Design a protein with these regions (language model features):
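Expand to "…catalyze enediolate/carbanion chemistry for C-C bond making/breaking, isomerization
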Residues: 1-166
Length: 166
């Protein structure tokens, strides 16, 4: 489970994602939003906790891009119409939105998934296919429970950023 954010801008992110990931992001983000996840302790769930308004905006933006690409609404778009957005705090932004290391790790991992597609996109310059092994494996999770894999991945990214003056 993952919500990709190679940039802090939801619209830029939606436009950057390849078709497969765009669809998958809508589904996975909605699963997090609706609480239909195998575990609520997953770092992808934890990072959005208290930020339901922004998560719903992320989903709506992805759904709009889906419509632009495919000329039809994503089925999840209908579910968002019933959401009472006023019940969410729209002033509390995720602390990790805009964190350079977080967004960079997202770009690295998207390149690992489909280098040929992503290496031509804005914000992905300067990372060659050969250099991908220089970066930590896993994701830089902004929120992770101690002693788990996600925490270890987070610490590996922090160590890498310190060693490389990122």
């Amino acid at each position: 489970m993952q919500t990709f954010l190679p940039t802090p801008d939801f619209l830029e992110t939606a436009k950057i994602l390849d078709n497969k990931r765009l669809n998958k992001q809508i589904v996975e983000a909605y699963q997090i939003f609706s609480g239909r996840v195998p575990t609520k302790n997953h770092p992808a769930c934890l990072m959005w906790e208290g930020h339901e308004y922004d998560l719903s905006r992320y989903i709506a933006t992805l759904c709009s891009e889906y419509y632009m690409r495919f000329g039809k609404s994503h089925a999840i778009r209908e579910h968002l119409q019933d959401v009472k957005f006023y019940s969410f705090d729209s002033t509390k932004k995720p602390f990790w939105l805009g964190d350079g290391l977080f967004h960079f790790s997202q770009r690295v991992n998207l390149l690992r998934k489909d280098f040929d597609y992503y290496h031509t996109k804005k914000f992905f310059g300067g990372i060659s296919k050969d250099s991908l092994d220089c970066y930590p494996k896993g994701y830089y999770w902004p929120v992770a429970k101690p002693n788990g894999t996600a925490h270890k991945d987070r610490m590996n990214w922090i160590e890498w950023s310190s060693e490389n003056n990122f």
